[in-house]
């Protein structure tokens, strides 16, 4: 399909469009035109209506929205300037109902090479079959016909606002290599919400650079993590101490179960013939000899029962008191009623000798 037009459009940036050849495929992936302009133009995001072509420029340009024509495309233009996609025999109506943006793109150098044309073919063969000029969910690039451009090449891209989901969906079409056409343009219009939609981990060579989605931990989280680690260390330390205590108890219990021979462990043995007593301490052995074998001075005897096995006065007094108390099953000292008044009299006389605590305290206060 070919459309010859003699219209001329004068813009602020010296944009002209003379004797253009407009190949219009019905299911192609791009739109090509021939122009001698040095600045690109950008179509808006609208779908087209089939079977007719109307270009409407509502801005500072001359409208020719009522110009409709049946378009046919020669095979030469289709094979040379179109990027993939079958061509329907049925003509298609492409309409621009909204004003074209007047934002010019910067001149691109070094793009008219066979490698770049091949790269455009790969990038523009996306999964969306574009029936109109306006893309939906991808970034197709529209180039002007190289027959009238000479040694330079210009590109026009849609400038409508895209959401984060559309950007994330369209990034797959630009993942061929680091020579993607998006790398020739400065990225200025992407906000923080749209940057979050881009998966930069899958495309580390993108000109947008690697975007770290994980923020550094906050001081509050660091303090909580440190506190949790300290608590865990204390818990493990307490468990280790309890395990050591249980192990020591088990060892001591196993020793006690085997039984202990007191005589064999005692080092102080009685040397009297026929006596096999042994004691752990030397004073116990000495007392044994004084009590049972008559060693040492100051031997004391009980006048109630006649026992003389006491080498100390306090031991004798304790024994005599037991005679003044009634008998019990677990006591081996016999109760003697005559010992009761004697023991009571000794207790009363002992109390008289001891000064009262209150008087002694008063005397100490007076002395100070």
From Swiss-Prot:
> Where is this chain primarily localised?
nucleus
Q: Where are the zinc fingers (C2H2-type)?
A: 268-292, 300-323
Entry note about domains: Both zinc fingers are required to induce development.
Q: Where is this region: Disordered?
A: 338-368
User: What Gene3D superfamilies does the database record attribute to this sequence?
Assistant: Classic Zinc Finger (3.30.160.60)
Q: What induces it?
A: Expression remains constant during conidiation.
| Domain of life, per lineage | Eukaryota
Q: What is the purpose of this protein? A: BrlA, abaA and wetA are pivotal regulators of conidiophore development and conidium maturation. They act individually and together to regulate their own expression and that of numerous other sporulation-specific genes. BrlA, abaA and wetA act together to positively regulate the expression of the Pks1 gene cluster that mediates the biosynthesis of an anthraquinone derivative pigment that contributes to conidial pigmentation that provides protection from UV radiation, heat and cold stress.
The subcellular localization recorded is: Nucleus
Q: Where is the composition biased (Basic and acidic residues)?
A: 359-368
Its keywords, alphabetically, are:
Activator, Conidiation, DNA-binding, Metal-binding, Nucleus, Repeat, Sporulation, Transcription, Transcription regulation, Zinc, Zinc-finger
Q: What is the name of the protein in this document?
A: C2H2 type master regulator of conidiophore development BrlA
GO terms, biological process? conidium formation; sporulation resulting in formation of a cellular spore
Q: Which organism is it from?
A: Metarhizium robertsii (strain ARSEF 23 / ATCC MYA-3075)
One cellular component (GO) term of this entry: nucleus
GO MF terms listed in the record are:
DNA-binding transcription factor activity, RNA polymerase II-specific; RNA polymerase II cis-regulatory region sequence-specific DNA binding; zinc ion binding
Its lineage reads: Eukaryota, Fungi, Dikarya, Ascomycota, Pezizomycotina
> Encoded by which gene?
BrlA
Effect of disrupting the coding gene = Leads to immature conidiophores without phialides.
């Amino acid at each position: 399909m070919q459309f010859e037009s003699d219209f001329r459009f004068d813009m602020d940036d010296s944009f002209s469009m003379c004797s253009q050849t407009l190949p219009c495929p019905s299911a192609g992936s791009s739109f090509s035109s021939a122009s001698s302009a040095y600045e690109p133009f950008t179509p808006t995001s609208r779908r087209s209506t089939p079977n007719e072509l109307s270009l409407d420029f509502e801005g500072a340009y001359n409208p020719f929205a009522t110009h409709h024509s049946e378009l046919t495309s020669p095979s030469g233009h289709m094979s040379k300037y179109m990027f993939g996609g079958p061509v329907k025999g049925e003509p298609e109506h492409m309409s621009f109902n909204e004003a074209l943006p007047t934002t010019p793109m910067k001149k691109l150098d070094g793009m008219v090479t066979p490698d770049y044309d091949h790269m455009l073919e790969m990038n523009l063969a996306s999964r969306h079959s574009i029936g109109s000029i306006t893309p939906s969910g991808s970034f197709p690039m529209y180039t002007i016909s190289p027959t009238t451009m000479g040694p330079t090449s210009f590109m026009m891209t849609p400038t409508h606002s895209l959401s984060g989901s559309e950007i994330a969906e369209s990034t797959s079409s630009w993942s061929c290599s680091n020579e993607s056409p998006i790398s020739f343009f400065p990225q200025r219009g992407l906000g923080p919400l749209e940057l979050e939609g881009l998966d930069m981990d899958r495309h580390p060579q993108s000109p947008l650079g690697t975007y770290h989605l994980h923020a550094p931990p906050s001081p509050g989280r660091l303090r909580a993590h440190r506190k949790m680690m300290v608590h865990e260390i204390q818990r493990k330390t307490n468990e280790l101490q309890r395990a050591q205590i249980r192990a020591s108890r088990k060892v001591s219990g196993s020793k006690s179960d085997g039984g202990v021979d007191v005589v064999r462990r005692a080092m102080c043995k009685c040397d009297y013939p026929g006596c096999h007593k042994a004691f752990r301490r030397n004073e116990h052995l000495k007392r044994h000899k004084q009590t049972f074998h008559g060693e040492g001075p100051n031997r004391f005897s009980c006048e109630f029962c006649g026992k003389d096995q006491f080498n100390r006065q306090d031991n004798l007094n304790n024994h005599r008191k037991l005679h003044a108390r009634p008998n019990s099953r677990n006591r081996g000292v016999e109760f003697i009623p005559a010992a009761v008044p004697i023991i009571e009299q000794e207790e009363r006389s002992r109390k008289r000798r001891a000064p009262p605590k209150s008087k002694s305290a008063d005397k100490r206060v007076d002395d100070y």
